UniProtKB/Swiss-Prot annotation:
The gene is ackA. This is Acetate kinase. One of its GO terms (biological process) is acetyl-CoA biosynthetic process. ATP binds at residues 15, 207-211, 282-284, 327-331. Belongs to the acetokinase family. The record marks 180, 240 as: Transition state stabilizer. Mg(2+) binds at residues 8, 378. The active site is at 149 (proton donor/acceptor). Homodimer. Its cofactor is Mg(2+); Mn(2+). Substrate binds at residue 92. Mg(2+). Can also accept Mn(2+).
Amino acid sequence: MDSILVVNAGSSSVKFQVFSAEGEGKLLRQIKGQVDGIGSRPRLRASGADNEPLADRAYPIESVSDVPAAMGVAGGWLRDELRISPMAVGHRVVHGGPDYDRPVLIDHGVVARLERFVALAPLHQPNNLDPIRSLLANFPALPQVACFDTAFHRTHDAVADYYAIPYQFYVEGVRRYGFHGLSYEYVAKTLPHVAPEIAKGRVIVAHLGSGASMCALKGGRSIESTMGFTALDGLPMGTRPGQIDPGVVLYLVSEKGMSPAKAQDFLYRDCGLKGLSGVSNDMRELEASEDPKAKLAVDYFVYRVGLNAGMLAAALQGLDAFVFTAGIGENSMRIRARIADQLAWLGVTLDPTQNSRHARLISGSDSRIPVYVIPTDEELMIAQHTLSLLLDRSSSSVRHERVS
C-alpha cells in the first residue's frame, strides 16, 4: 500500500495519521493515532478507518522522554506491527515566516530557515521541527513535506499585514502572518461543495478550539485574520490571552520583574481562559462550572468573537455567510448560540433544533445570512499537499527510501 504519514507534533504529544494513496490524487484515511503523555505517562492510542481500536498501550516514562522518542514509538508500531512503510511524511509546521507561501519539500537548508522562527512560535515550532530532524537523520532519502499554518494568509493585501513601527522591521519579517491556515484552507476547499455561490462570496470562518482565531475569506482566499506576528494575538484561547495592549507586557517586565523568558512562558501558558477563570483552559469544564470567574471567561470569549466578527465584516465590506469549525465551534451548541446572539446586528439567527443536532446548516429560516458548521480536517490537507508535491517530482528519477 502506497501511504502517506501525517505528523502533528506538540510539546506533550505526537498525533499521526496514515492515508493510503488510491490513484488519481485520491486519499483514504486508514489510521489515526497519537502518542501522548510524553515525559509523564506515555501512551500510544490508535484506531483504524472505521474507528476500530488498533492500539492502547502504556510505556515507561524513560522510554518516551521527548518528541523524537515518541516518533520512534509511533514509527516502530506502524512498521513492525502493521507493516506500513510510508512513501512520504507530511508535517504541520506552524510558522513559515516570510520565506514560505506554500508547502515545501524539506532538506537541511529548509530546517535551518525554519529554526529562525522558533522565537515566533515557541509553543509549537520547536516540537514541529523535532520529528523532521529525527527523520532526516535516520531516513535522509525519505521525502518530507512541511505544510505551514501561515501560508494560506499570504493572499492578504500588503497593507493588512503591516504594524505601525519603522518599516525596517517589516523588511526583517516583523509583520502580521495569521495562523490556522491549514484549517481555513480545508474549509475554503469544502465550501464550494456545500454552497457553491456562497463560496464565491464573503465568508467569516471561526476556528474555535484551544487555539482560536477567525479569518475573512473572499472568493475562497484569505484577506484578513485575527492573529498576527505570533499565535498569541486575536481571540482569547485556552492559555493564550489574544489581543493585549503591548503596555501590559512592558508592565510585566518593568513592574512585576518578569524576564523576557518568563513573560513569554506566562503569555503562552498561563493566560487566556485558564488565566481569567482560574479554573481550566477547557471550554467544556468552564461551561459546566458554577464558578463566577468561569462564567466571566466564557462571557469574555463570546464577546471577543463577536467583536472580531465586526472587524472582519468591515474588512470584507459585508458578509454572505458565517462558518464555525474546530473543537468548540464544531461541538458546543451553547457557544454557537451565544455567538449568534452577538451577531444579531448582522441579521443572524439560529435554528435551535439544527444547532443542537450539530447540523451542517444551523441558521434559522429568517436569518439574513446562512451559518454553517464545517468540521475541519487539517491532516487531510497536509496529506493532499504532500501527495501533490510527490506527483510534481514524479518525473524525476529520485529514488524514494522507504522507512524500513
